[in-house]
Amino acid sequence: IPGLVGSEMCIRDRYSVVGRQKYDEALGFRNSYEGPEIRPLGERCIVGFGSSGGPPKLPVLYNNLTQIVQTKDYVILLAEMNHDARIVRLNQDHYQPSFNPWLGDSVGYYEEDSLVVVTTNFHVPQNLRSSLDHRFYGSTSMTVTERFTRTANDQILYQFTVEDPEIYSQAWSGELPMNNSGEQLFEYACHEGNYALPGILAGARRADADGVEYAPTDPGRQ
């Protein structure tokens, strides 16, 4: 899926029967306003919208900058969106499957000039990655393999492959360039200014009191 254009259309046909069912069920929860715990993670300022923090790292409408910090034992991928920091442990083993951190469990190694990062053990609430630009579903045992390859002084080629036999009938892949913007990251102070979620829930309670049905979420806009 070069450039990730129309990515949802490209992977829609790759869902298994079980995968499509779970995807539809997860998308249906977006029409529930019973409380904050059931609302999307981006609305709750827990992780960024969609898959902006990765893996795979996919662009959204804004705050797409990523700062890469490297030490002898770790690589940190800091996304400007919600300040998601993914720590990649170099030349280590994965944790036990029962350990499911936000953004998954990432381990990496170098293959010639490419940094290869393999991530699995995803956190259950992150099964549905949904934004205006992309949307897909993955199980906790989904495996994402990423490759970061410098192609110029100011560019890294980012490539990834998603494998999840329970959800997809075959693997799917994509790539996009990561260009050096020369800009600094700004603080994404989500909780401090999050008036949207209280407003969403207050609107739902008013609709309940008035006996009004919620307008269904347009899947093309979520």
Task: For every predicted segment, state its role.
Residues 7-8, 12-222:
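PEST-like low-complexity, intrinsically disordered acidic/proline/serine-rich tracts
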Residues 2-6:
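Positively charged, low-complexity/disordered segments
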